[in-house]
């Protein structure tokens, strides 16, 4: 018992947590079927109703101002890269201010990179000294954000990297070949490390609404299929917090144990980024599309190619029309400030959502091929919302299937529009879209 107590104290885990880490051996003996709990099913519905979240890629890589992959793309030596942690002191970071900014923008949740591929942990982890507490800052970033989210009623999601470019026990995949680490691949020890960290995140930071995994694709070119044992990990998460949703950015069809289907830089079904392939779109799971506000995920000082507010608002509408949430990314600066242009875009999105939010939040997607790329639709029960995304539209020739079309009004003004019925089909006429309008919404009852 003394040895067990010592190990538990050394790792910072409770006895219950330690037993949970031993659960994979039992999980392998269970069937692959996954039956989500009642809490989980409710959480899925709540998540789908939120429709808009903020992705935050922030770590010591922000000091290089070259994006979150700089350890890989810059072919840096890992030991030299790690020294930058000694300079990480985000003196302007204010979690409450961040969350207020996101809330004012109309976002309902955040997803924060607790540990990216460079292995640096942004919380007070006991599993590695390579963390925020061993920088000059010495404050738990994850705790600050978690507390701010809980105080403001903002959903809290944690990004967690499956792959690691620093640890010697991580089995080398198709990335991370240039860091100079000593390779001693042992997936069992690495798997235990990840599970111990996940246990910390799910026991020390209050309610966590989702875990967002990334990096599974690092072994997609192995000659022998790599067994990540993700189902065991998913089961661990669901035991620790049954309502916590699991998503994995693996670019594959959903797997047993997952609660969200994720799409990277891709509105579901469009495969514009080439990551979705033949994965299809789940008809049972909530969906989420993540996209950058400029070009990079992490802060890159030279990347000032921000999408316009019009583009972002239209992306939000298109995503909602597919029945999906939009997770919009921001790469905070190393000093703890949010980039000025990003804040400006958030303000513009928030202004639009204050006036048009009922056409986004709590809605379902609508199949409406007739609209092409000019008009998309969402619905809430028998109320349909026609999102006009091009300024030259003057009429809607055909309403979506199931739309009775008894009354049509401009959502923001209440102005009534004429509904015309010809040969059994209803159309809306007399539409005048303001020149600078990103998304002109017509509410049809």
At which residue positions do the language-model features occur?
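N-terminal secretory signal peptides that target proteins for export/translocation
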Residues: 1-7
């Amino acid at each position: 018992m003394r040895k067990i107590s010592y190990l538990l104290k050394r790792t910072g885990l409770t006895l219950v947590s330690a037993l949970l880490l031993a659960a994979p051996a039992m999980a392998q003996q269970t069937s692959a079927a996954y039956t989500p709990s009642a809490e989980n099913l409710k959480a899925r519905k709540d998540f789908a109703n939120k429709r808009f979240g903020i992705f935050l890629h922030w770590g010591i890589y922000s000091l290089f101002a070259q994006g979150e992959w700089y350890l890989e793309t810059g072919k840096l030596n890992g030991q030299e890269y790690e020294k930058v942690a000694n300079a990480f002191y985000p003196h302007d970071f204010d979690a409450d201010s961040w969350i207020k900014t996101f809330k004012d923008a109309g976002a309902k949740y955040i997803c924060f990179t607790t540990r990216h591929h460079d292995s640096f942990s942004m919380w007070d982890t006991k599993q590695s000294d390579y963390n925020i507490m061993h920088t000059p800052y010495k404050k738990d970033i994850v705790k600050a954000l978690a507390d701010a989210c809980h105080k403001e009623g903002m959903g809290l999601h944690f990004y967690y990297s499956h792959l690691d470019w620093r640890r010697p026990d991580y089995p080398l995949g198709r990335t991370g070949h240039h860091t100079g680490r000593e390779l001693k691949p042992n997936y069992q020890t690495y798997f235990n490390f990840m599970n111990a960290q996940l246990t910390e995140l799910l026991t020390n930071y209050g309610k966590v609404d989702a875990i967002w995994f990334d990096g599974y694709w690092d072994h997609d070119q192995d000659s022998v299929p790599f067994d990540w044992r993700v189902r065991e990990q998913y089961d661990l998460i669901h035991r620790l917090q049954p309502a916590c949703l699991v998503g994995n950015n693996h670019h594959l069809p959903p797997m047993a144990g997952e609660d969200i289907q994720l799409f990277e830089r891709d509105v579901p079904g469009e495969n514009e980024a080439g990551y979705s392939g033949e994965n299809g779109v789940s008809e049972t799971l909530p969906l989420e599309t993540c996209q950058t506000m400029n070009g990079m995920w992490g802060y890159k000082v030279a990347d000032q190619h921000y999408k316009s507010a019009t583009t972002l608002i239209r992306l939000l509408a298109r995503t909602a029309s597919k029945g999906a949430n939009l997770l919009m990314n921001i790469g905070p600066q190393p000093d703890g400030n949010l980039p000025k242009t990003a804040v400006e875009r958030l303000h513009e999105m928030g202004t639009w959502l204050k006036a048009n939010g009922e056409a986004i939040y709590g809605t379902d997607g609508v199949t409406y091929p007739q609209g092409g790329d000019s008009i998309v639709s969402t619905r809430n029960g028998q109320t349909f919302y026609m999102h006009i995304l091009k300024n030259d539209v003057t009429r809607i020739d055909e309403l979506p299937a199931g739309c009775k079309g008894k009354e049509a009004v401009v959502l923001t003004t209440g102005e009534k529009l004429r509904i015309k019925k010809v040969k059994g089909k209803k159309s809306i006429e007399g539409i005048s879209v303001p020149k600078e309008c990103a998304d002109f919404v017509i509410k049809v009852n």
